[in-house]
Amino acid sequence: VQASNGNTSIKLDGILWIKASGKWLAHAAQEEMFVPLELAKVKASIQNDTEIASPCNPNQQLRPSIETAMHAVLRHSVVLHVHSVNAIAWAIRLDGPDLLTERLDGLPWQWIPYAASGIPLAREIQKAVANRPETDVLILGNHGLVVCGPDCHAAEKLLGEVERRLAITPRRFPKPDTTVLAIIARFSRWQFPDVDLLHALGTDAASRKILRGGVLYPCQAIFLGPTMPLLPPAAVISKFTARWSGQDTTPVFVAVERSGVMLNEKMTSAERATLIGLVHVTLRTEESARLRYLKEAEVMGVLNQGAHGYKEVLVPEESMSLSEIRQFDWQPKTISKRNGTHRESSSSGRHRQHQRGA
């Protein structure tokens, strides 16, 4: 689980306790984390295709996860949805269902093709489990893993077993070339990563090839943007001088081919965690693997959904296509949903941002 991604729930006495949107499961012992919802009302909302019912406690400020509908349609008392890097490495493959047949043999599992988070995904799961109600494990295409159980202990034990079966040994990657990266470090706002693993996005040819192909899963687009900021070494000085030195429109990281990665000092902890997760996924994915990338409409749907929580992400105007987005720098405008105000930078004003999380 990276940052606010992933969600868990438990059903007790007709109440669905679901992780709050934007909350980190890693902070569950220190913060208020779960939102109580009347399960019957949530199911009615799904049936009527209306907004998920309000929390039982009207004074609670937390909002239920966007995946609340998915948790509600599953019969199990405990549902764990995680963004396992091993599971995602299988979930992005076109041959994933076939390859997992042997790995998950003996477990009541199903593959759910990619569907948008919320009610669309919940309905796909609802159809799948209607035919096989014994299902306890779901691999969500281009998304992650769901395991279920009658209680917390059983669900956690099953999660461990599935993770063991899905485990992939990551590739080794070349060490970074700090000569080129040191040039970037001279510019304000840029720093070396404190996790060497991140350099793989620049030094590992297979990872670069994989990420050039597009967006692999929603959180990649939500937290890191729809395109990868990748530069050849020869372009470092010109690009930073002309575009990314001292501007507000810089990406949160940049990968330099055969050299490594540098981070923007404004990178948030959520963006950092998501980037680390992305590297883990690419290093577990074979260069020759046939991958399913999110389609343009799916990426745009993710960026426009605006319901994931508290992460600010770039959302282009409806008239723009994903290919047009690539012509622009990232994050030119921020809109605050709380007060309706906005600020615009010096670059194109054809973008806006929403608040989102998991």
Residue ranges and their predicted role:
Residues 354-356:
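Cationic, low-complexity basic patches in intrinsically disordered or flexible, solvent-exposed regions
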Residues 1-347, 351-352:
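Glycine-rich flexible loops
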